[in-house]
Amino acid sequence: GITGICQIVKMTINYLKELGAKPFIVSAMGSHGGGTKEGQREVLTGYGITEEAMGVPIVTGTDTVDLGVNADGNHVWFDRAAYEADLIVPINRVKLHTDFIGELQSGLCKMLVIGLGNQKGCSAAHETDFCKFSNMLEESARLIIEKAPIGFGIAIMENAFDETCHLEAIPAQRMIAREKELVKLCVEKMPYIQVKKADIVIVEEIGKDVSGAGFDPNILGRSTVRTGYLLPIPEFQRMILLDVTDASHGNAIGVGLFDVITEKVFEKMDREITYANALACKCILDARIPMIAKNEEEAVRIAVKSCRNIDIHNLRIIRIKNTLKLEEIQVSEAIYKDEFL
């Protein structure tokens, strides 16, 4: 999730009220929440964004309007409730995307195209190959800014400690150009695992509140759609998953990138919600089921047994909370002696 998102949204609402506006919140999450009204409201509630807390109505829906065709020939769909408003203010974190590299990645433009596109717009956008995704976002965002009443956007940047380090209001006319500048700054703000080589990586949890892909491939280097990365990534053979966050509401997207999962992960996975997400972004391998272990101990035994050419008496194991929380990690004695002493 975005640090301080409730406070940022509330401050924006209060500012608009001071100007005489009567703001309301529109869920802008593409296929998240299963792509349903109820699911989207549940996700917002999980982040503390409720009508009572924000003091304004919240509109969740799937109805869209067709704004036209982008350069790839695909229709650009946009949330009807937002389109019929007098002014739209997108709020999002600008960061490196999990599936592609480009001048535009995750940010305000993606919020306009994917988030406010709802399930229909999200699926249409993902007709584009990821190698062309950044260009698609730019062309589609340009069309949306031209056709819809976008006023300004609130861009959020976070540092390696998951803390807000930059907050900026960007007029619609400068949104695309300014976001490109902010994306360049993201690389130096991103955390990474400072280990060169391991046998096994244990991840305690994945979830939509951690990353749109469940976990950030920029940190762990596993993806079904991308090959290049901008950050240093440890070399390892097996990856284990122990849990799915409660805030993910059963969405276990990303589970398919692991080699071994626990029964707890399998039991918490809501297949309908996970599959809806996987189909919307056309990454169905991200939802496949790996080998299932009873618990963490059995998962590690399976991982060790399936590794090749390792020293079983000096196992190199990394354990992290998730790809957002990297301030502290656990490493086995072999890694500690080799890389930190």
Protein language model annotation of sequence segments:
Residues L19-K22, A53-V56, D72-G73, Y83-L87, ...:
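Short coil/turn connectors at secondary-structure junctions
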Residues G1-C6, M29-G35, K95-H97, G207-D209, ...:
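Gly/Ser/Thr-rich loops at beta-strand to alpha-helix junctions
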Residues W77-I202, I206-G207:
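Conserved, well-structured core segments that form the ligand-binding/active-site neighborhood
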Residues D216-L341:
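C-terminal non-catalytic interaction/assembly regions of soluble proteins
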Residues Q7, G35-R41, V69-D72, D99-L104, ...:
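Short acidic, glycine/serine/threonine-rich loops at helix termini
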